[in-house]
Every structure is written in C-alpha cells, then in structure tokens.
Amino acid sequence: MERKNRGILKNKLFLYLTEFFSGMSVMAVELGASRLLAPYFSSSQIVWTIIIGTIMIAMALGNIYGGRTADKSPNPDKLYGRIIVAALWIALIPVVGKYIIVGISAVLIFSVNNNFLILAAFVACMVIFVFPLFLLGTVTPSLVKYSVSNLDDNGKTVGTLGAFNTIGSIIGTFVPTFVTIPAVGTSITFLIFAGILLALSIVYFVMEKAGKKKVIASVLIFAFCCGTGYSDSFAFWENNLTYEGESVYNYLQVYENDERVALSTNVLFGVQSVYMKQDELTGMYYDYAMAAPLMLKDKPTDQMDVLILGMGTGTYATQCRK
C-alpha cells in the first residue's frame, strides 16, 4: 500500500519538524499555564494536578479526533489550518486570559461554597487551555498518516515522529522555565511559541500556494495580539505597585506606602513579608516572631546571633536589629 504526498510534504523532514514544534509548544503552554494561574490560584500541587490533568484530557481527545479525521479526510491543509487556529488561540491568552480567570473567579465565588480553588482553577484551565491543546493533539495521528508511505518501514517512521515530539517536549520544558519566562515574562513566552506554530503553518501554505486569505488574516490577528498582549501585569486593577515581575521561581509583587513595604510571591492576595518603616507591628501573625529577641537576657540587639532558615527578603533580620 503506497500513498504519495504533495509539495513540501514529500520531504519527511518538514513533517518531523511539525511534530517537533508541536511537542515543544504543548509543554511551553503547560508551563505558561502554571505561571498564568499562579498569581490567582497559587502554584500548589492541587493547581499543578489540574493543569496536567486537563491538558492530558485535551491531548487524548485530540489524538482520537485527529486519527479519525486523518482517515476520513487526509488533507494536510486541514491539519495546518488547525495549527493556525491553535497558534492564534495561544497568542490570545496573554490578551484575555487574566480577564477570563478573574471573571470565572468572580462568578464562582458567589455561587460555590466549597472547594472554590479547585473548581475555579479547573474551569479556568478548561476554558483557556483545552481547545488549543486539543487541536495540537490532532497533530501526531495526522502526521503518521502523511509520513507512512508503505508498511515496510512504518515502525521506523512512527518511532522517528515520536522521538521528534519527545525532543521538542524536552526543549519546551527547559526553555520557558530557564530562558523566556525569566527574561521576557509569561505573556511574551506565549507569543513566542504561538509565533513558532504560526510560522510553521505559513511556510506550509506558502509552499503549497494555498490559503492566502487564511495566512493574511492569521498574521493580522497575531500582530494584534503582539501589540496588546505583551504586558506581564497580572494585577491589572493596581496602579501603584512599586514592582511587578517574574523570577525563575515566582511571580513577584512589591507594594509600598508611607507605613510599610509588602512583598507577595505567586499570589495576588497574600503577603509573603512586610517591612514596617516606623517600627510598628503589622497586626498579622508575623508579629509573633518579633518576640524572639526579647527572650535573650541582657544582650543588645546589635550583638545578637540569630539563625534564620530561609532568609527570604531579609525583613525579619532587619526587624530583629531594631
């Protein structure tokens, strides 16, 4: 049984590259999802479980749909059209994602009494991430259809596709975490990987001399997303933050007024540490730790030796010296 591909798909390398960038983008979106959700729902094991679970559901459904579609209508135009839609959806996440999360939370907080965190995070994941990853889940079975030309070497071909997907996934795991998110933030990370998927599909349609309107429309939409979705401000309702950004480990937010400097990590509504400028108490549970220096008998604060496990921002050490 033999089947011939047309145009650029005659070169299996392009099919392998499609599998590579698809796998890379799936992992990049998964890691980006954790950073997008962390300021609102934290980065706990519960949230990670929800992210991984919903993405696996989306990929499984995409595999089933992609396999059936490839058998019924083995037209590569449809596959690369789906990749364009997935790319544009991912590019729209920085534009509207945080508003969707806040909207879902606002609705559920008044309608749900128990397990608000679990339900809100799950619904947000379903609405924002399931559809594009469902579309990317259709890539592998479709590429198997296009790349297997005969049954003599089909095992080798499928194995090579799997290897390219896995290598792409590995790169898509490390690059966002250690390179793009610390350097340019979560929003631009989404745009970078959306742009890669879009460029891949555009190359296909240009080489096939097809889908001209589709290509032009997708470029315009992507340009709009780049122009409006580059901001990494998760607390979009705040106008007086001293600092808001991301590190390798956390989302960071610093708020300062005449009385205090407060740092939040990974959550918008909690406080990691508070520094009081006027030697006052915070009124929070942190104040209990300030009693420790009083337990030392007849020893001035500038001569104290204090072992602090986890220095953090150094707030406690500074306060102890006072």
Predicted segment positions?
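Conserved S-adenosyl-L-methionine
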Residues: 322
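Short, surface-exposed charged micro-motifs
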Residues: 251-253
